Amino acid sequence: MGENQETQKSFLETVKFDSNGLVPAIVQDHETGKVLMMAWMNLESLKMTLEKKKACYWSRSRNKLWLKGESSGNMQEVHDILIDCDGDTLLLKVSQKGGACHVGYHSCFYRRTVDGESMEICDTLMFDPEEVYGKQS
């Protein structure tokens, strides 16, 4: 398919959802390029994100739509959405308010391996999850 034909397809037609109706979305800070998180989107959450310019995902554990920041206030303003060459992965470029990670860090990728076995924290703690979400039982 030539470039002109490819760009004429609608964005939503190009997205290849998996057998569960989901597509992975990598989330990146639009200014720094830092990867903040990975989440899943279904058609409804993707349409909502496109409409509101606020990141909305599909929670597999809760089996419902999840507007990022609805509990914590740590919203993601969406600046751009890119799709990969296969159409099966999205990249959201966002402005992150507060931390992206539910355990309080700026990025969900807040740990790195030191020697292949041990880990160290390599990111900034932005909030105390107990203060934001309450104590989890």
Swiss-Prot record:
Pathway-wise, it operates in:
Amino-acid biosynthesis; L-histidine biosynthesis; L-histidine from 5-phospho-alpha-D-ribose 1-diphosphate: step 3/9
* One Gene Ontology biological process: L-histidine biosynthetic process
Textual note on the cofactor: Binds 1 Mg(2+) ion per subunit.
Domain of life where this protein originates: Bacteria
Sites binding Mg(2+) sit at 84, 86, 88
What Gene Ontology terms describe what this protein does at the molecular function level? magnesium ion binding; phosphoribosyl-AMP cyclohydrolase activity; zinc ion binding
**Compartments where found:** Cytoplasm
What is the annotated role of this protein in its UniProt record? Catalyzes the hydrolysis of the adenine ring of phosphoribosyl-AMP.
Family listed: Belongs to the PRA-CH family.
Q: Which HAMAP family is this protein grouped with?
A: HisI (MF_01021)
The record's listing under NCBIfam families reads: PRK00051.1 (NF000768)
Q: What name has this protein been given in UniProt?
A: Phosphoribosyl-AMP cyclohydrolase
Organism of origin is Chlorobaculum tepidum (strain ATCC 49652 / DSM 12025 / NBRC 103806 / TLS)
Gene that specifies this protein: hisI
